[in-house]
Amino acid sequence: MAVLIPAALVTFFIGIAGIIFMPDEIKNKPLDFDRGTIKIDHSVIDVEIAESDAERQRWLMFRNEEFSLNSAMILVYPKSDLYALWLLNIQYNLDIMWFNEEGKLVYYIKDAKPCENPLDPHNCTYKTTVPAKYIVVSTEGFLKGNNITNSSILTPISI
């Protein structure tokens, strides 16, 4: 057991260093996410869809351009669970919404701040307290701009 803890720490720090010092050609490589449309209450939202494990892991990392208030990214999971988002290498603040399988908003965070220190993930990891199947993320101000409330409903149109 005493050997496993230092080995795990070394592995963790090597992984962090790899992400931080990733070459620009990998960082800046655009991902071609599928596009679709959702509706939240009465607002029709254009979305980029992150559905595979690789897409959900890379999602908005190293992306400089922010979303407009009528666009977002939706992370789609195979089943409901307590999914967390680590805002490592995210360039701007986000509004984050978790929706259950029925499309009901179960949790949200306004103005989530990205990591300032990648060695302290506790200050930039956001997790729902209720199982969710979908996470919708957009630029800060999305919640207010689209009048999202605790009773908001997500309706997938084409995802």
Regions found by a protein language model. Give the residues of each.
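Compact, glycine-rich, soluble single-domain proteins
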Residues: G15-I159
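N-terminal Sec-pathway targeting helices
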Residues: M1-V10
